[in-house]
Amino acid sequence: MKAVIFAYHDMGCQGVQAVLDAGYEIAAIFTHADNPAENTFFGSVSRLAAELGIPVYAPDNVNHPIWVDRIAELAPDIIFSFYYRNLLSEEILHLAPAGAFNLHGSLLPAYRGRAPLNWVLVNGESETGVTLHRMVKRADAGEIVASQRVAIAQDDVALTLHHKLCQAARQLLNSILPTMKCGDIPSVPQRESDATYYGRRRPEDGLIDWHKPVSTVHNLVRAVAAPWPGAFSYNGSQKFTIWSSRICPDAQGALPGSVISVSPLRVACADGALEIITGQAGDGITVQGSQLAQTLGLVAGARLNRPPATSGKRRIRVLILGVNGFIGNHLTERLLNEENYEVYGMDIGSNAISRFLLHPRFHFVEGDISIHSEWIEYHVKKCDVVLPLVAIATPIEYTRNPLRVFELDFEENLRIIRYCVKYRKRVVFPSTSEVYGMCTDASFDEDKSNLIVGPVNKPRWIYSVSKQLLDRVIWAYGEKEGLRFTLFRPFNWMGPRLDSLNAARIGSSRAITQLILNLVEGTPIKLIDGGQQKRCFTDIRDGIEALFRIIVNDGDRCDGKIINIGNPDNEASIQELATLLLDSFDKHPLRCHFPPFAGFQVVESRSYYGKGYQDVAHRKPSIDNARRCLGWEPSIAMRDTVEETLDFFLRSVDVAERAS
């Protein structure tokens, strides 16, 4: 059987040798040229191929039609990929009659994506493995041929685990390749519900947050220990790297980041202390912890810090229009937690962002985007990333004020998009899950699902089509005029500071705020058309983390992309949401300050929203794009979100109002 192999790294060498030992003919090997900036501690596939007398190539783009044709001329029966770093096109995958197969460094479907070796250590896993699977268009998603488990010892670091995985891979290939050569190829579909995705790790991801649990910090040290770039921190302006550590349970009440002792060198974390066994100051040599403390001039009680702001590198300027809104104020908080971001914002109010007004990297102007066009144009020109978050996004307004919805959501935002085109600025635009309308797909795919809305005489759809039309305009500007953009589609984000109870009193709020108002005032909870409509509720913290990663745009992977941001696992009907909320309300310590529960009341949507309303039975996102582009996965359970949101609103009610 003739094989074409795509391979790199130690795993690539193991794979090539295993294929030869199994009696395959290798027509050619495709690999990568080594990057001079990378620590190439691993074996060379190109050198191995040359020594074996096998043709070897390292094209910049193996998916180019010229290379696809050359591979086709080789007429492979089967294709193998062993740690080749680029995805292969469907044209290449279809060239081999027996199929194309990839060796992945985890027990799929867990830890799809990049750097699974490091991520399993970061997350403190006790087991991983290697998996041979059939290659399909989606990375790491094809049917499983074979897998082998690998136990992770508590003293394993990245390099020792790497060696274990290489050994396991060789054992796996030695057992399965002869069987495959005879045409017997097992195939077990992956369980998508168990799939997790992780993105590429960068050297800067090794920055230690001393406010994390000590186990988290220790696992980070293990995950990026030499020959990887290492976990690091700062003493003043001096960077130092920790190469090995151990956990000490007692932090002696010290604040996170405080040096507890210098011999041994121990630093307080959130719930314990990290003992630094070996480390390195700057570009110096590796020394034991106590000598590192001496080199850095550390004394007991000193505080380690985050990296100093780099004077030679300008901070990234982010313009947020609608900064006082639900997404805007939470995003501002996330950005200001990072030293290299500066936030410029405008909104008609400042109640939700009052906590930032004195922050030196937050610049706010109170104003209306429909009036202050000169200020907006100037700041679009001045900033690096623009987020036009201003919109009317409450369903009752779609039928009550459809023209105002169109004027603000489409016309005013179109002007801002044109400024971004004019000054060649990147825009991160909030599309909406509403654009999918009455789509019948089980889960809504950004690139494939049809966008289906009702008839013109149903003004309820004016928000959806305004957003959809702007999505299409932005896409066209990207195609024709080079606008850098990302469209993100939130699916029912919830959390503190979502709307207000006053907005709920006039019916202009999202569902959970309205339900909380009913509980606070002792009025019946209204279930529109019985409350059987299903939504996927997403915690604001999960949503903001995904949005932050879009702004970071690692490797420009978000450019020109549409990304759903939602939690498919948190699907519930409005009735189920109300029941969960009521249960949390009854258990809340402030429950005694509010009236008795007034029951549920089923009402027709027309009587509640008015003429021209249509509802949607379900709305579940596919989040494959978010997993692939962001390395993001939602993690917060719906009950936690409901309890935190309820607590925020109950504590915001005035004491006098509670008593009444």
From Swiss-Prot:
This enzyme's EC code(s): 2.1.2.13, 1.1.1.305
UniProt KW GTP-binding keyword: no
Keywords annotated in UniProt: Antibiotic resistance, Lipid A biosynthesis, Lipid biosynthesis, Lipid metabolism, Lipopolysaccharide biosynthesis, Multifunctional enzyme, NAD, Oxidoreductase, Transferase
Annotated site (Raises pKa of active site His): D140
A single cellular component GO annotation: membrane
Residues that, per the record, bind UDP-alpha-D-glucuronate: 393, 398, 432-433, 460, 492, 526-535, 613
Pfam families from the UniProt entry: Epimerase (PF01370), Formyl_trans_C (PF02911), Formyl_trans_N (PF00551)
Annotated positions for site Transition state stabilizer: N102
Sequence positions that bind (6R)-10-formyltetrahydrofolate: R114, V136, K137, R138, A139, D140
Location of region: Formyltransferase ArnAFT: 1-304
An annotated GO BP: lipid A biosynthetic process
NCBIfam families for this protein: PRK06988.1, PRK08125.1, PRK11908.1
Signal peptide start-end: none
Function: Bifunctional enzyme that catalyzes the oxidative decarboxylation of UDP-glucuronic acid (UDP-GlcUA) to UDP-4-keto-arabinose (UDP-Ara4O) and the addition of a formyl group to UDP-4-amino-4-deoxy-L-arabinose (UDP-L-Ara4N) to form UDP-L-4-formamido-arabinose (UDP-L-Ara4FN). The modified arabinose is attached to lipid A and is required for resistance to polymyxin and cationic antimicrobial peptides.
Keyword Transferase carried by entry: yes
Full protein name: Bifunctional polymyxin resistance protein ArnA
Organism this protein belongs to: Salmonella enteritidis PT4 (strain P125109)
